[in-house]
Amino acid sequence: LNTAKDIRGDLPEYLASFEYVNGGLFTNSFNSPRFSTKSRKMLIECGSELDWSDINPDIFGSMIQAVADDEERGSLGMHYTSVPNILKVLNPLFLDDLRDQLKEAGGNGRKLLNLRKRISNIRVFDPACGSGNFLVIAYKQMREIEAEINSRRDETDRHSAIPLTNFRGIELRDFPAEIARLALIIAEYQCDLAYRGQKLALAEFLPLDSENWITSGNALQLDWLSICP
C-alpha cells in the first residue's frame, strides 16, 4: 500500500491488486496483534458487513474519548465538542460573513470568483486539535460554500481550491494526531463525492499527499508560526 504499482516487483495477484495509497499511512511496519477467535470474527464482520462508505469523520472525537479511561481524559483535557457547539464558534468567526458575501454576490461571476479566491486563502488552526473535529467541520462548511459558488458559475466539475494543508493542528499524542489527519482526508473525499461526483472523486483520491499538516507535539513549546506557514 505504500509502494507504487510500477515498482512492486513480483507479488501475488491478491497483493498486487491493492491501490497505491501513500500519504504515510502505511510507511512503517508493525507487528500484527494476536486475535482470539471471537475478536477475529468481529473484525471480519466489521470489514465485510458494515457499509464504510458513509462513515462520518465528525464522530471520531467521540470514538477516541470513548476508548480512553476517565483519568486519561481528565489529565489530557480530552473533551469531545459537538458539531452544534463548534458551529457556535465558526459561524460568527467567519462562516456567517462568507455566507453573507455569497448571498450578496448572487449570480455575479466576478464577485463569485473573488469570494472563491478568498475562501481558498483562509487558514484554520487548532493548537489542541485532538482528533480534528473542529478542523473537519470547518473544512466541510467551507466546501459547501465553495460548491454553491461553483454551481452558480457552472463549474461543478472543478477541482476544489481549498487544500487540506490550510487546516493545521497540534495534538500532544500521536494517535489522535493521525486520526485528525485521516478524518480530514475522509472529509475531502466525501465532499468531492457529494459535489463533483463519484468518477472525479475516485480518480483524484489516490495516491494521498505525503505532506503532514497535523503536528504531534506540545503546543506550549512549539513555534506556531513554523507550523502555520
Predicted features and spans:
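Non-catalytic, mostly N-terminal accessory regions of nucleic-acid modification and defense proteins
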Residues: 1-97, 192-202
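SAM-dependent methyltransferase catalytic region
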Residues: 65, 69-229
